[in-house]
Swiss-Prot record:
Quaternary data: Clathrin coats are formed from molecules containing 3 heavy chains and 3 light chains.
Region Disordered, annotated ranges: 32-136
InterPro entries: Clathrin_L-chain
Highest classification ranks of the organism: Eukaryota, Metazoa, Ecdysozoa, Arthropoda, Hexapoda
Name of protein: Clathrin light chain
Intracellular or extracellular location(s): Cytoplasmic vesicle membrane; Membrane, Coated pit
Length: 219
């Protein structure tokens, strides 16, 4: 009984070889479009050759692509062609952008600002010098006043000491006792808030100086 075992065996088709053939054909069409049809795509490799190279490993990947046509990606000299006007060559690094010239207004403003700062520094130094001179003058005046006050105090102390020595050693004339005592007193009406009020005592001394008490000698 015949079950159809003698039917013709169908040709085996390798999917990898068929895919490579389609890709090579597409690359050839792309090259034809780019070059304007001046060069036709090279014939695609047969399915058996592609299958043999893929399975046998007799050709490298570069040989397989060159045998089947690279579609314009690689020329006969081994260099890649430019596609779409774009180059793969490295672009040189450009230098720094040229410096723009500073506008006239900004340059003028900088010069005026610099001049103002210089004038301000000069004025500040002048004021400092005036303050130093004024402080020195005030200090000299204060020292001079202190020196004069000390000299007057010393002179008054020496005079008072001489008068006290004269009163102790000299003879006292009648009626001049209170006058001599009044000379030892300070009748300047200065009020010392921290001290005692001696205004009444001063008034008594002045009264006795002007109207001394007459001392009657006993017989």
């Amino acid at each position: 009984m015949d079950f159809g075992d003698d039917f013709a065996a169908k040709e085996d088709v390798d999917p990898a070889a068929e895919f490579l053939a389609r890709e090579q054909s597409a690359l050839g069409d792309l090259e034809a479009e780019i070059t304007g049809g001046s060069a036709s795509a090279p014939p695609a490799a047969s399915t058996d050759e592609g299958l043999g190279e893929l399975l046998g490993g007799t050709a490298s990947e570069g040989d397989l692509l060159s045998a089947g046509g690279t579609g314009g990606l690689e020329s006969s000299t081994g260099s890649f062609e430019v596609i779409g006007g774009e180059s793969n060559e490295p672009v040189g690094i450009s230098g720094p952008p040229p410096s723009r010239e500073e506008p006239e207004k900004i340059r003028k403003w900088r010069e005026e600002q610099k001049q103002r700062l210089e004038e301000k520094d000069i004025e500040e130094e002048r004021k400092k010098e005036e303050l130093r001179q004024q402080s020195k003058k005030e200090l000299d005046d204060w020292l001079r006043q202190i020196g004069e006050s000390i000299s007057k105090t010393k002179l008054a102390s020496r005079n008072a000491e001489k008068q006290a020595a004269t009163l102790e050693n000299g003879t006292i004339e009648p009626g001049t006792e209170w006058e001599r005592i009044a000379k030892l007193c300070d009748f300047n009406p200065k009020v010392n808030k921290a001290g005692k009020d001696v205004s009444r005592m001063r008034s008594i001394y002045l009264h006795l100086k002007q109207n001394p008490i007459q001392v009657q000698k006993s017989t």
